[in-house]
Swiss-Prot record:
Gene Ontology MF terms: inositol 2-dehydrogenase (NAD+) activity; nucleotide binding
One record GO biological process: inositol catabolic process
Membrane-spanning parts: none
Gene designation per UniProt: iolG
Protein name in the entry: Inositol 2-dehydrogenase
Pfam (any one): GFO_IDH_MocA_C
Database matches in SUPFAM superfamilies: Glyceraldehyde-3-phosphate dehydrogenase-like, C-terminal domain, NAD(P)-binding Rossmann-fold domains
Enzyme Commission number, as recorded: 1.1.1.18
Protein source organism: Mycolicibacterium gilvum (strain PYR-GCK) (Mycobacterium gilvum (strain PYR-GCK))
Amino acid sequence: MTDLRIAVLGVGVMGADHVARITSRISGARVAVVNDHLVEKAEQLAASIPGCSAVADPLDAIADADVDAVVLATPGGTHEEQLLACLDQRKPVMCEKPLTTDVSTSLEIARREADLGRPLIQVGFMRRFDDEYVRLKALLDGGELGNPLMMHCVHRNPGVPAYFDSSLIVKDSLVHEVDITRYLFGEEIASVQIIKPTSNPGAPNGVVDPQIAILRTVSGRHVDVELFVTTGVAYEVRTEVVGEHGSAIIGLDVGLIRKKGPGSWGGTLTPGFRERFGPAYDTEIQRWVDAVHSGTNVCGPTAWDGYAAAAVCAAGVESLETGLPVDVQLADEVTSPSPQGVRESDGCR
C-alpha cells in the first residue's frame, strides 16, 4: 500500500503534534507538505522530515499534486476558505474543531460537501476515539444502565492562553461535552443554559470562570457540565452517566496514582490534554488514514456534527450573556453522502 501523502496546515501545538504523530506512529501515511503563517517555522519542520516540503500559501498546499489528503490545524477563522478549497480539490480533510467559527458557514460547508455526493470532511472531536468513552458508549448501547436519564461532566484546565475570554470557554471547551453528549445519547441538544458561579480570583480580568452549562436533549435528558479552566492544578475530564438501572463514570483513573500512607492519602493528576487523550488522537488519525485508503474518507464526526456543535455553542454564548436557557436552532439535516447524524457517525469499527 502506497503511503497517503498528507499536507498539515498549521504547525502550532496541535499541528506539530499531528506531524510528529503521522511521522512516528501512524502507518500508511507520511507528511508530504507543511504550511504555517510562520513560514520559517514550517521550513525548519519540513527540513527535519524526509520527503517533506514547506509551502507558504495554504491554498497552494491543498492544491499540490503531491498531496492526497489534508490535516487542518489552522486557526478557526481560516477554516471556511481552506475547507472549501479541499472540497474543490476533492481531497479528504481532517479538520480540527471548530468546523468554522460561526453557524451559517458551518452549515454551508456541510451542504457543499453533500452536493458533491461523496464524504470528504471529518471533524476532530477526538473523545469519540478515547477507549473509556468508547466503552461507555458500548455500555449504554448495550442497555446495561437501562434508559440513560442524566449526565454529569467535569472539564478543568490548569490554565489557558492570555487571549482566552469567557465565550471561548463555551466555544473551545464546552464544545467537547456538546459533541460527547450527542455521541453518547444519540440525539440532538435542544437547549443550553450557562450559569455563572462565583468567579475565580485567579482568572484573567473579565473572564467568567468557572461556568456551569446545563444541556437539555430533545428527549428531555439533562447534562450538567462544570467548566473551570484556570484551576492552577491539572487537566481533569470526567463523565458520569446515570441511568434507570445504575450509573457509570469515566475519567477517574487516567493519569491518577492513588497513594495511602500514615495519616495521608494522595496521588498525581494528569497535567495536560496530551497525557489524557494522546492515545485517542493516535487512534483518530490512524482510522482516518485507513478510511481514506478504503475510499470511505470519513471515520468519525462529520461536517454535520461540526455544524450541530457550532449551533449549540452559539446558543451557549447567547445564554452566557443573558443567563437564560436558549433553544438550539438546527436546520433540517442535509442529505449527505456520509453517515450524518449522531447515531451513525460515532466512528468506524
